[in-house]
Amino acid sequence: MYRIPYKKSIGEHIPAKLNSTVVDFTAAMFGNKENWGSRVYFENLYLKDGQKDKDRAIPLLGANPTSFQNYLETDNTGKAAYWNAASNIRGYKLYWHKKCDWRKDKNDKNQNVNVSKEFAPLKQGHTFVGRLRFENLSAVELGALANVLSLGDDGSSAYKLGMGKPIGMGSVHIKAKLYLQNDAYYTTLFSEAGFDSGVELGDKQKYIGIFKQYMNEMLTPASLRLYNERIEELHYIMDDSHLQDSSWAAKTAYMNINNGKDKDLANHRIPLPSIKDVVNKR
């Protein structure tokens, strides 16, 4: 069997606007390789309570069927696009929150100890604390950062951090508070309680409002509508309340090469559902 090369590279399917030379919020705040450094710094997170035993994860070397329609947008007819077509990549790589039986019985004689990796996963209910520092951010940039860290304030939106995201690990809730340097930061060393930290609790909603106002003023009505739709879909995929749905595991399961239905998805080039289709929002 011979592989036929595509006329277009993968990079040609990335929307041109994403290859723009205009500096966006992400590049401005987190740096751009050798051009300029980051103004946001992640410190270590510390576990508030202890954890003892390690678990052994299942080997993740099995083949998973895939096809190009998983990665490209479909046309107006709903048919799958091809790499030679003038179609864009579907979007960003994100993972659903899911419950997976990723543990492997250590007494299982069929497991290959050479490919099984021991690690200490975060157990449910544990809490980490830490700081994310920033410097020289404008009010709009600070609002953008605060907005990202406040997506989980609704109590049902969880983030994905660390390893094991594809198998259901790394789902965490974040509660962020904003602290700002006050006028005494460089002038006062001691306070009645001891050393003066020189910081005070800030109003993150104030800066989030500044950021949202900036977006409303800078984006065209069409771009703003598209932005709001993407934020809506982001909330859908971050929503961990779906885990209470008895059919959720089947909806978000990976394709299996031994499953006839999954083979049909690839063989017949059936486009995968959108986020809204998965959560039945349309």
Region spans (language model):
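Basic, Gly/Ser/Thr-rich N-terminal segments that form RNA-phosphate-binding interfaces in CRISPR RAMP
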Residues: 1-282
